Amino acid sequence: MKRYLIVNADDFGMCRAANEAVFDLFRRGCLKSSTVMIPCPAAEEAARFAAENPQYAIGVHLTTTSEWDTYKWGPLTGAKSLKEETGFMTHHAADAESRADLKELEAELKAQIEQARAWGMEPSHLDNHMGSLYGHNTGRFEVLELTLRICGEYGKAFRLFTDVHELVPFPGMIMEMQSQLLGIIKPWAQKYGVPMPNYLLMPNWTDDLRTSYEHYREEILKIWVNIPEGITETFGGLLTGFRVCMKSPLFTCSKDRISKEMSIVNSRIQIR
């Protein structure tokens, strides 16, 4: 069995800087997959790019959180349980998961998919911003079941995993816990007919890896070229021409650097 790595550009549509980076990397042939944050200010531009370029796998990055301190967005539906007093979505995935009214959440997720369609794109697949729909943050796994049911209704794949492997760690979760989570995910994925990758490779920004981009690059490429057989998906948010007040320099990595790294990995494993 061959090894496949899907590298998905998350946060498409989050801001103009994200759009510029993703546009450029698609055109260079360094990306084949991305997902749009529909509630965000630059989402329409991203969705229209997707509509004009159906050769790319561009889906919807289902969003229920707004993590930036001074750059925010709110739910399309205005649902009370999905926003703070400011009118914006909550900062943390655990808060979003614990506070969400299931009926309001269903309406919001469907609104995001339908808004993408209204802008002309047909989402190729669905995934989730910050893991706020996985259920593992607070144990509200009914949130995950709802999400997978919606995926099934729309006939869309969802980014989670159907297998566990020591070479593809889930940060902060030992193998036993990963197996327990898999026991929840897999039956619902089968019940609702939702395709998923075999493995989900989560970026793990430890303090050690935050010391420099070069160090992170070296370590992440070691992981990428040693993925197990099957389909593995990983992801990252891309920006260009934009600096943020973050502890990690990774948030300022340029599209030129990403282009070089992708060419290196492509020589070792098959990129999807």
Language-model features, listed with the residues they occupy:
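Active-site-proximal segments of metal-dependent phosphoesterases and phosphodiesterases across multiple
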Residues: 132, 136
